[in-house]
Amino acid sequence: MRKLLLFIFLLPLLFSQRGLSQPVDSIDFYMLTCEPGNEVYSVYGHSAIRVVVRGTGRDIVYNWGLFDFDTPHFAFRFAKGKLDYMVGACSMKTFMEEYRVEKRSVWSQKINLTNGEKINLINRLDENMRQENIYYRYDFFYDNCATRVRDIIENSLTGSVSYPVEENEKTFRELIDQCQQRIPWLDFGADFLLGLPADKKATVRDEGFLPMLLMKNLGSATVNHSGKREPVMSSPSLILDMRDVAEKKPDVWILPLILYSLLVLVVLITFVFGIPILGKVSDWILFSLLIILSSQLEI
């Protein structure tokens, strides 16, 4: 996270329309999709935008998945999906190394943009990277690292975007259940914390809150360019294949069940019954339990 934050105030200078000396047609944009990881906060995957300025060595990744561990009630806000997240950026080399270490595969899709749309996207990235805009209120279904990528791409396009039609729409709960089939405690925890809003039907566009589905659905979407419908982006290309080297963890359920019971107990005591547990200490208890739980399971 420290490496990512180093670039927060540098990127507007690197890629703003004013500071860009290269012709816009020498800039390429890509959507990156990272497979789910072995931690609670990475189990659903990740999305980012890559910007390459050919002939300059500039190769930067914009990432809306950063958060501050010092946020009050961090663990509860995180689990509930109501945490303040932030945008940052790093070099493509740094970004890829992180996923290589975590043994998580990465896919890339080139975004199909006119020169005018490229300028739109540059300006939107520049706007996002301003100090007053780097924080946003995370929402699990409607405003996360994947939906931010989707929205900034859609809003940069000058034509209308059409998604493929899906006859049997799933609920948000059914979609996340698919991600948690081998993690019963997390499945139960999500049901406990997300409540009734998770039972709403999700459109194909809505499904983009999950990075792997965003890769599929936005990759199948089309945009109207001068009366002609064209793909929004290319088919996914696997640029980091870690599927055969990912570590597998044994199925150990007793400890997770005990720890999850403690997690529920802390949440009930602190937030339902209103009994404070040493203030910020309860945050660290919650987050520690989440991390320990995730480390016990095969994701």
Residue ranges with predicted function:
Residues 1-22:
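Bacterial Sec-dependent N-terminal signal peptides
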Residues 13, 18, 139, 197, ...:
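Generic ordered-secondary-structure signal
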Residues 22-245:
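Soluble extramembrane regions of membrane proteins in the secretory/endomembrane system
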Residues 244-299:
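Alpha-helical transmembrane segments forming the membrane-embedded cores
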